[in-house]
Design a protein with these regions (language model features):
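Beta-propeller blade signature
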Residues: 87-97, 137-143
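Repeat-based blade/solenoid architectures
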Residues: 45-54, 101-113
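Short consensus segments that form the blades of beta-propeller domains
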Residues: 45-46, 79-87, 127-132
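Mature extracytoplasmic domains of secretory-pathway proteins
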Residues: 65-66, 76-79, 84-94
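N-terminal signal peptide c-region/cleavage motif recognized by signal peptidases
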Residues: 14-16
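Acidic, small-residue rich beta-repeat scaffolds with periodic aromatic anchors
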Residues: 3-5, 18-32, 36-44, 108-157
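Short, flexible beta-strand-to-coil junctions
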Residues: 72-76, 96-98, 122-129
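Acidic/hydrophobic-patterned starts of short beta strands in beta-sheet-rich repeat architectures
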Residues: 60-73, 113-124
Length: 157
């Protein structure tokens, strides 16, 4: 009798794979999820899932407040495995205030450099004149006055 009760209890639980709660997600990022869901549905009526790790909170601009990051690496479409990512990586959307910066990357981290926060992303090696395994990185800093991400292309002297 106990196994039947256990199975009945499981049947009342909500599905976990698609049940990531997005109620607190800012509108600018909710729009990104909605567009992804629609793009997936357009490919043979695919089913979209937002997997764990899709949303991250971290201080991107050094104001000691947690900003928002939406990682397309945690998007899944049942009918198009590579719809959101490629060998170049996946797009991550970094929300500071009301500004979204979207950057394709193969991974990212935030570092403290002096009094600045630096968004460091790994780029496809072709962005540095090489190929896929070539080490290549982009460093960006948030400019709070202009409300833009700032970076410079590195040049070797």
């Amino acid at each position: 009798m106990k196994p039947v009760m256990f199975i009945a209890a499981l049947a009342t639980l909500p599905p976990a794979a698609n049940a990531l709660d997005l109620t607190g997600l800012p509108a600018a990022l909710t729009e990104k999820v909605t567009a992804a869901r629609q793009a997936c549905a357009e490919v043979e009526n695919g089913e979209f899932a937002l997997e764990w790790g899709a949303v991250t909170r971290t201080d991107l601009d050094g104001d000691l407040q947690a900003d928002w990051v939406l990682n397309e690496s945690a998007y899944a479409c049942s009918t198009a495995v590579s719809l959101f990512c490629s060998t170049g990586g996946c797009v991550s959307h970094f929300l500071v205030g009301d500004v979204v910066g979207s950057f394709r990357n193969q991974g990212w981290t935030v570092l403290t450099f002096g009094r600045n926060r630096v968004l460091l992303t790994r780029a496809h090696g072709s962005a540095c004149g090489g190929n896929s395994p070539t080490p290549c990185f982009v460093a960006r800093g948030w400019d709070p006055d202009a409300k833009v991400w700032r970076s410079v292309e590195a040049r070797t002297e």
